[in-house]
Design a protein with these regions (language model features):
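C-terminal motif of bacterial Sec signal peptides marking the signal peptidase cleavage site
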Residues: 14-17
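Bacterial signal peptide processing site
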Residues: 19-21
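Positively charged n-region of N-terminal signal peptides that target proteins for export
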Residues: 1-4
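Solvent-exposed hydroxyl-ligand-binding patches built from regularly spaced Ser/Thr
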Residues: 31-222
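Short, linear, compositionally biased motifs with a strong N-terminal bias
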Residues: 10-11
């Protein structure tokens, strides 16, 4: 009788141990599945913006207002400029973008709830522009960026800079299709010959060489 009782206790102990092992296994599997799900969601960040580190030789998108062009105390002409850039994404990162991922922009994070890749390379995020989402397009360098209607980039301010104006500076204004191209020189900013100060990152760029502005271009925008 004692032997029977002993074997019964042993069997119960073993069964209890097996049950605990099974429960532990189930918990482990649940945690692992959750971890895998979390890892599957990727955050896509814009490429680092180096504009402010390359002001001596660059093409810059700018804005300026009346009075921002002047002659300083040393007799050199300067321009006080506001500089702009836009979010750019690596093509490899975008090629792996999927529903559920997070796209990081300069304004915050966007969860990708819908993704539609077009044959022309355009990618519609969350329905695209027509459904309050946005469009990503690529350029000749292979990077992707957000594009609005009429191919307008989503510019945002990144800083301010004062840059010297070259004595050989020329400003080409083609913003009025009826007037055609108008050419201005440095002094035109100082004597009031330049009267239209609608300079925005959408229509105005400058070219800087060796730390001096040698050209400004303002183009027509619809």
């Amino acid at each position: 009788m004692k032997k029977l009782l002993f074997f019964t206790l042993v069997i119960c102990f073993l069964m209890t141990g097996c049950g605990n092992d099974k429960a532990a296994t189930e918990v482990t599997e649940t945690i692992s599945a959750t971890a895998v799900t979390e890892q599957a969601v990727s955050k896509i960040y814009p490429l680092p913006d180096t504009t402010m580190n390359q002001l001596t030789d660059a093409i810059l998108s700018i804005s300026l207002e009346e009075g921002d062009a002047y002659v300083d105390d040393t007799g050199k002409m300067q321009m006080d400029l506001t500089l702009y850039s836009y979010d750019q994404y690596d093509m490899v990162d975008i090629s792996m973008l999927k529903v559920g991922d997070i796209l990081v922009t300069h304004t915050g994070e966007v969860e990708v709830a819908a993704l539609d890749r077009k044959e022309n390379g355009t990618i519609l995020i969350n329905g695209g522009l027509d459904e309050n989402g946005f469009d990503l397009i690529t350029n000749e360098t292979g990077v992707y960026y957000e594009c609005g209607y009429s191919d307008v980039k989503n510019w945002h301010e990144i800083g301010e800079a004062t840059i010297r104006v070259s004595v050989d500076f020329m400003y080409y204004d083609t913003s009025d299709l009826d007037k055609g191209e108008i050419l201005y020189y440095p002094g035109d900013f100082l004597i009031g010959a330049v009267t239209d100060y609608n300079f925005t990152p959408h229509n105005t760029t400058i070219r800087v060489e060796n730390g001096q502005i040698i050209e400004m271009h303002r183009v027509y925008t619809p």
